[in-house]
Amino acid sequence: IKRDGRPTYNFANVVDDHLMGITHVVRGSEYLSSAPKYNLLYEGFGWDIPKYVHCSPVMRDAHNKMSKRHGDPSYEDLIAQGYLTDAVLNYVALLGWSPRGEQEIYSLDELKKIFDISGISKSPAIFDIEKLRYFNSEYIRAMSPADFAAVAEPFIRQSVRNERYDAAAIAALLQQRTEVLTDIPEKVDFFDALPEYGVELFVHKKSKSDEASSKEVLEKIIPLFEAIGDWCDENIMAAQTGLAESMGVKNAKVMWPVRIAAAGKAVTPGGAVEICRILGREETLRRLRIALEKLG
């Protein structure tokens, strides 16, 4: 009933659906009680009654429905939070509906082909943000490098504003390590500016690295980096593995302090080779010399 007291909403809804040739009405279970009213209107007009499919609600948890009023995300919110449209569509399609088999990742065209209302569950579905993160990471990994670089660049540039650092090269380090796009800025901020860090980062048990060994490595790698002709992955790697061999240590004992000095972080996308290549020779050497000063 509208505010003017007339039953125009239900009337218009039935007329509209009939004129559009609607055969199936799919809606939330909260509308189940209104079905008899619609049926009376269809019968009054002498029209065929469509088939009704009433879907169970999507829940925040076992007791509460999702609600924008209570801070649950809308589609627009999820996109703004770094989720891909295709990943959201895929995940939402599986809320309250189950395809046959174990496959979970589907393109929209695949979903259109396999969808059948018989797979709709009578039980409410619970929205699991961690599951959506998993779906999103799978979609990110499946993208072509060029497509990922295109969607990642705006997020890279939030923290890496220096245009001399190639966004596509940085994106290549991120693609297999990113779940949502909004994680990107804090992962790569060290490219734009070397963060403050303590010498304790040079201590790493697995790499058998400590402050003294790190100082020795940096003192020896700097002239080797200075002597490289073509600043590329192959030559940067060769300088480090060659030093490790000459010192009689494993590669990790050389690469750990180089990466810490170059990035100022213990956890980075990419290793010492890729980071040094993107930074360039001059900036890499500058950062390695800063590390030497820290190490005394």
List the predicted regions and their residue ranges.
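Charged substrate- and nucleic-acid-binding regions of tRNA-handling and nucleotidyl-transfer enzymes
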Residues: E234-L295
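Active-site cores that bind ATP or allylic diphosphates and position pyrophosphate for catalysis
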Residues: I1-H54, R60-M66, P99
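Short helix-capping/linker segments at secondary-structure and domain boundaries
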Residues: M20, G96-G101, R141-M143, T182, ...
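Short alpha-helical scaffolding segments that buttress acidic/His motifs in well-ordered protein cores
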Residues: Y91-V92, N136, A171-T178, Q240, ...
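Small-residue-rich helix-loop
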Residues: P145-M247
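Mature, solvent-exposed C-terminal subdomains and processed small-chain segments of exported/organellar
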Residues: L32-P36, A80-D86, L94-G96, A212, ...
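Residue-level signal for inorganic ion chemistry
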Residues: D17, Y38, H63, V88, ...
